[in-house]
Amino acid sequence: MQGRLSAWLVKHGLVHRSLGFDYQGIETLQIKPEDWHSIAVILYVYGYNYLRSQCAYDVAPGGLLASVYHLTRIEYGVDQPEEVCIKVFASRRNPRIPSVFWVWKSADFQERESYDMLGISYDNHPRLKRILMPESWIGWPLRKDYIAPNFYEIQDAH
């Protein structure tokens, strides 16, 4: 079943794949990494003015990495805002996705966390560096193929 946003994107010739609806009835779409930035700008202009959350996950060991965006269309006088979930999948070997920091500023720390935990590089992000792990940390802790080190060096905070 095609949702309202998917139908609008098809009408305007924008490439995507409908993934159906989640348990709350929120439409979920898949966008290719190379199309994501332009579609993000279009969605912002269309009215999706709030990035509620961005997260990422490892689909399967040795498989793709996914960056997930929950967007909300907030309008004055509308009691029930319209929501959509966008999934952008990236190759594990070279996980690169365009940053949407310049569209939704709230993507700043969220994209940095996804980079820090899974190694997804968000192109054109102004401060893409580790946010939770030390800069010297090797590897991406939330990847399913990550092997935890046997020894952690505790650094003196003083």
Swiss-Prot record:
<keyword id="KW-0813">Transport</keyword>
<protein>
    <recommendedName>
        <fullName>NAD(P)H-quinone oxidoreductase subunit J, chloroplastic</fullName>
        <ecNumber>7.1.1.-</ecNumber>
    </recommendedName>
</protein>
<keyword id="KW-0874">Quinone</keyword>
<dbReference type="InterPro" id="IPR010218">
    <property type="entry name" value="NADH_DH_suC"/>
</dbReference>
<dbReference type="Pfam" id="PF00329">
    <property type="entry name" value="Complex1_30kDa"/>
</dbReference>
<keyword id="KW-0618">Plastoquinone</keyword>
<comment type="subunit">
    <text>NDH is composed of at least 16 different subunits, 5 of which are encoded in the nucleus.</text>
</comment>
<dbReference type="InterPro" id="IPR037232">
    <property type="entry name" value="NADH_quin_OxRdtase_su_C/D-like"/>
</dbReference>
<dbReference type="InterPro" id="IPR020396">
    <property type="entry name" value="NADH_UbQ_OxRdtase_CS"/>
</dbReference>
<dbReference type="GO" id="GO:0019684">
    <property type="term" value="P:photosynthesis, light reaction"/>
</dbReference>
<dbReference type="GO" id="GO:0008137">
    <property type="term" value="F:NADH dehydrogenase (ubiquinone) activity"/>
</dbReference>
<keyword id="KW-0150">Chloroplast</keyword>
<dbReference type="GO" id="GO:0048038">
    <property type="term" value="F:quinone binding"/>
</dbReference>
<keyword id="KW-1278">Translocase</keyword>
<keyword id="KW-0520">NAD</keyword>
<dbReference type="InterPro" id="IPR001268">
    <property type="entry name" value="NADH_UbQ_OxRdtase_30kDa_su"/>
</dbReference>
<comment type="function">
    <text>NDH shuttles electrons from NAD(P)H:plastoquinone, via FMN and iron-sulfur (Fe-S) centers, to quinones in the photosynthetic chain and possibly in a chloroplast respiratory chain. The immediate electron acceptor for the enzyme in this species is believed to be plastoquinone. Couples the redox reaction to proton translocation, and thus conserves the redox energy in a proton gradient.</text>
</comment>
<keyword id="KW-0793">Thylakoid</keyword>
<keyword id="KW-0934">Plastid</keyword>
<comment type="similarity">
    <text>Belongs to the complex I 30 kDa subunit family.</text>
</comment>
<dbReference type="GO" id="GO:0009535">
    <property type="term" value="C:chloroplast thylakoid membrane"/>
</dbReference>
<keyword id="KW-0521">NADP</keyword>
<keyword id="KW-0472">Membrane</keyword>
